[in-house]
């Protein structure tokens, strides 16, 4: 049985069980390696500029901060979730053909796309927020690109049957608000609006 487990580790990098232990030492080591390689903290270019003000001691509720910046700060200050790069690696390695094209209709940050590009695949991500798309394309690895649009329009940006995998993480209701854009479902006022 131990030999069988070791073979699974060799074949799959992490044992492919129903529940994956992300606190495991090997997982954490891989995650650190990816984090070092990707150098991505989930911010946008605008947030990076805003963080300079934050580091000088300006607080969230300071009246000197313009209203739109207060909202952005409130939404993004240490409350952002980043897609685990090891999950990206495993999903690509386990379920996609080598050199495959992966699409994401709710792309968010650069992690999924850059992991897939680094592993030899290509990636097309659709993201609503213009500043996030600009930031992502600046930090993009060869083979990864982001397009500013609503994820519902993904077929306007890829050819039919051109993708080998859809890997996405749509927003949850009432957990994180990414923007106040009209077509951003993360800012839905109630669950009925969100689900429809």
Model-derived segments and spans:
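Class I S-adenosyl-L-methionine-dependent methyltransferase catalytic core
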Residues: 1-196
């Amino acid at each position: 049985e131990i030999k069988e487990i070791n073979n699974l580790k060799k074949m799959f990098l992490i044992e492919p069980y129903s529940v994956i232990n992300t606190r495991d030492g090997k997982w954490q080591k891989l995650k650190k390696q990816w984090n070092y390689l990707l150098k991505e903290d989930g911010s946008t270019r605008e947030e990076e500029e805003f963080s300079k003000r934050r580091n000088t001691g300006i607080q969230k509720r300071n009246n000197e901060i313009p209203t739109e910046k207060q909202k952005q700060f409130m939404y993004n200050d240490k409350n952002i979730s980043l897609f685990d790069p090891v999950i990206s690696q495993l999903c690509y390695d386990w379920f996609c053909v080598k050199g495959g094209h992966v699409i994401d209709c709710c792309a968010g940050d650069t992690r999924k796309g850059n992991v897939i590009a680094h592993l030899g695949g290509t990636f097309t991500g659709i993201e609503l927020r213009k500043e996030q798309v600009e930031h992502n394309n600046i930090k993009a690895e060869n083979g990864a690109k982001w397009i500013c649009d609503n994820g519902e329009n993904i077929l306007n940006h890829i050819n039919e049957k051109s993708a080998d995998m859809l890997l996405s993480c749509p927003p949850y209701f009432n957990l994180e608000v990414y923007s106040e854009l009209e077509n951003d479902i993360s800012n839905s006022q109630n669950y009925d609006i969100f689900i429809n």
